[in-house]
């Protein structure tokens, strides 16, 4: 058919004088990709290679052909190839990478963005630091100057604005997340609620003037109202200028084997046998599995069908299998998003066709609007406390030294407490015996694979009663809160700065090299740390630290740095953990009701929390059409079971029931209930 069409096109060209061009219909890159592409089509369309009524590209010629192949194919009309080349020469497109394309924030008339940011910051500074020291003002000024020089003023104003909108509209916002809590500007803008001075958090861990990269402020919102904040951003910056971000699910090793086996119409038992030979490890590949499992290697070498299955799977492994919308990512542009990136529709939602990594490389503003269930629990509990007790709590102003809260944590009674409710963490809290927020921060940072190895040393230091031995006295002010252990990335930066004289910006580069185990960089930095570089870094020896001590400190620091945690992030999560623990300790009924409401679609979790209520002496009342609500509710110090948590009863039916009861009074009998609800859901 194509041959007939081509002959007709040549004839039309000669009759009309319109020049010919030739093209190459390409669906895969290499000729040998024909079969894997055919298998991929089967996977995509739910067919097998044996199905006759399926989509296929027959002939194996739909690959990107070389210039020589194109000239050979169209040797009867060489001018067509020449014309195609002329068009290609006239086409020119270039992408500008790493150049910021931030949207502009509209400031009040007569003000500049820089001036407006300073105005808001200094107003916040005056409230948060009423008796401010000069050095604190200097830090704020340094941060503002750095932000201005790096071109991020609009970024901070944009984040400040939508967080202000959320708080003004009663949407609970988390205390912060990640390294942003190390910024005094973020704190003064109320983007974060963690005082960076109080917890020795470092600005350069968040924004490094010696390593230009986009700031990354991730924000947690009540998960039920997160979309309201996104909708506000869409209204403010324009629907065309805001889009959510695509994400791709790729074909992992086992999934690739199963999908390919299904497409090849292989017996299920054979495919299942091969897939189970692949170790269930994070990041496992088929190639690694062949080296690790001799049975798999033997099957590959001896069984023809298995060889075909694995060879084809190797070609498809890692390719995108499906696309979806990123759970939190939103891109905001100064012009319509389509001016910068291609778009696609997914269930009515406009998405970028580029992933967030590429968007960042293109200099576009990516924000993460995260929904955190725990914040919804806190907000629901606070509202219930106000309804029942008439007390309006401000969760940002809780006393941090509440012995009742720490007693509960030390006993491991942390079911439902953010970050502290796993069995292992409960046991750790019983061993750690935290008595302040610093202990909780360290606990969250330590309880991870890798750092867990240092837990015994940390607990030993904590119990030593101030008798911790330091390799050099200059380490004491840096490590005293963690009893001589390097727990945080910020401590690595402080050691490099205070002992060897690095700038904080450069110390962050060293920290990054350590965490990524860059041997060549580390060998170079080791010499600079100990002896200096004769220019910017004086080194430990010049600062009065013996060579042996400097070598030992660097080696220990390198070992710890592989696992060191971001203290800013741990501090934010410790605050949320403390808030939930405080609510559980002081208002257990309201807290447990809110907690169960947040998981009422998960029967197993509800059951677990019911058991916790029994241990706490909280009585659970059965569901009642005259007393109950959609959510778990508090009544006379007891918890009423949620109507919407009853299996096979929809939320719409519950809402209709409650609305009818509130409008016309309680139901007096089953007959009354049936008559009044007849025709409803």
Task: Give a label for each model feature.
Residues 19-23, 96, 244, 419:
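A structural signal for short, well-ordered beta-strand segments and their strand-loop junctions
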Residues 90, 107-108:
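Extended catalytic cores of very large enzyme megasubunits
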